[in-house]
UniProtKB/Swiss-Prot annotation:
Keywords, alphabetical: Acyltransferase, Cytoplasm, PHB biosynthesis, Transferase
Protein name: Poly(3-hydroxyalkanoate) polymerase subunit PhaC
Disulfide bonds listed in the record: none
Gene field: phaC
Additional free-text comment from the UniProt record: Poly(3-hydroxyalkanoic acids) (PHA), of which PHB is among the most common compounds, has potential uses as a renewable, biodegradable thermoplastic. PHB serves as an intracellular energy reserve material when cells grow under conditions of nutrient limitation.
Compartments, as annotated in UniProt: Cytoplasm
GO terms for MF: acyltransferase activity
Organism of this sequence: Allochromatium vinosum (strain ATCC 17899 / DSM 180 / NBRC 103801 / NCIMB 10441 / D) (Chromatium vinosum)
Primary subcellular site in the record, as a coarse category: cytoplasm
Gene Ontology cellular component terms for the protein in this record: polyhydroxyalkanoate granule
Length: 355
């Protein structure tokens, strides 16, 4: 007897279903319109070099905007439209719905003219000037910051160096301890000769970083998801959702060489938030200088920033008002999943409104 029970009728039906999905999928892919991302209306209010500062329009029916503006500081390594990927999966829309007056820094696409930019240029230069713009425009002394991933590390540095300008700080999937045992990216980076890489290439190509991130989970991120895509092909909406994510994953700006060199050395190799030694503009970054309320949000299934890498923030600041929020999802799901829309953004808005 054959060890596997194969029924010809069921096998035939499976093959027919597979062929139908492939055929319908080809039609859906050919007829797919341009993939839209960054769906919420916004206005450019300030620009400098490659940077553009956007203010999001308050939607009809939204509550009156809070007097203290919220500035989102995104990472350099990806594009910020992940926070506004589609109508029903938008961190931006969720924040607007809670009454936040939302601004976002779009870092743009650095080129060779930006090779010499340093962390000091980003933190004490670009971010500080955006904060000052908001302070003047809204007539307030302090703003709220929301830092995402690497942007969360930037926001921590900024809040430590400029505590007089930050009212509340929210960090999302932000690495603080860069050397937790389960941090695959950190383990990979430890033996990289970053000086050779930057001296050779100038800026670090975004494509190189893409494949580095994908290599951390090669089976699920480069193979299995495309096999699973067959099950989506006969649904035009699911195809568009899949393509939106693909667009974002592979839309990675090059990294300004000197900033990348310093960030890798100071944080991934020297674990600067825990060990010290990070100096910007002649001043050492000390998280104990952060005195404002802090909301630290992390994802329990995050393979890029493990939960313990974010949890390490507890006790490192001088804030008397520290709160953690653990989300049962991954690094991207914390922005785009249906569960995140119901739990994460409302929690951020409520936390800010209470302060």
């Amino acid at each position: 007897m054959f060890p596997i029970d194969i029924r010809p009728d069921k096998l035939t039906q499976e093959m027919l279903d597979y062929s139908r999905k492939l055929g319908q999928g080809m039609e859906n892919l050919l007829n797919a319109e341009a993939i839209d991302t960054g769906v919420s209306p916004k206005q450019a209010v300030y620009s400098e070099d490659k940077l553009v500062l956007y203010r999001y329009d308050r939607p009809e029916g939204a509550p009156e905007a809070q007097p203290v503006p919220l500035l989102i500081v995104y990472a350099l390594v990806n594009r910020p439209y992940m926070t506004d990927i589609q109508e029903d999966r938008s961190t931006i829309k969720g924040l607007l719905a809670t009454g936040q007056d939302v601004y976002l820094i779009d870092w743009g696409y650095p080129d060779q003219a930006d090779r010499a930019l340093t962390l000091d240029d980003y933190i004490n230069g670009y971010i500080d000037r955006c904060v000052d713009y908001l302070r003047e425009a809204h007539g307030v002394d302090k703003v709220n910051l929301l830092g995402i991933c690497q942007g969360g590390a930037f926001s921590l540095m900024y809040s430590a160096l400029h505590p007089d300008k930050v009212r509340n700080l929210v960090t999302m999937v932000t690495p603080v301890d860069f050397k937790t045992p389960d941090n695959l990216l950190s383990a990979w980076v430890q033996n990289v000769d970053i000086d050779l890489a930057v001296d050779t290439m100038g800026n670090i190509p975004g494509e190189l970083l893409n494949w580095t991130f994908l290599s951390l989970k090669p089976f699920s991120l480069t193979g299995q998801k495309y096999v699973n895509m067959v099950d989506l092909l006969d649904d035009p909406d699911k195809v568009k959702n899949f393509l939106r994510m693909e667009k974002w994953i592979f839309d990675s700006p090059d990294q300004a060489g000197e900033t990348f060199r310093q960030f890798i050395k100071d944080f991934y190799q020297n674990n600067g938030f825990l060990n010290g030694g990070v100096v910007l503009g002649g001043q050492e970054v000390d998280l104990k200088d952060i005195t404002c309320p802090v909301l630290n949000i992390f994802a329990l299934q995050d393979h890029l920033v493990p939960p313990d890498a974010s949890r390490a923030l507890k006790g490192l600041t001088s804030s008397p008002d520290y709160t953690e929020l653990a989300f049962p999802g991954g690094h991207i799901g914390i922005y785009v999943s249906g569960k995140a829309q119901k739990e994460v953004t409302p929690a951020i808005g409520k936390w800010l409104n209470e302060r």
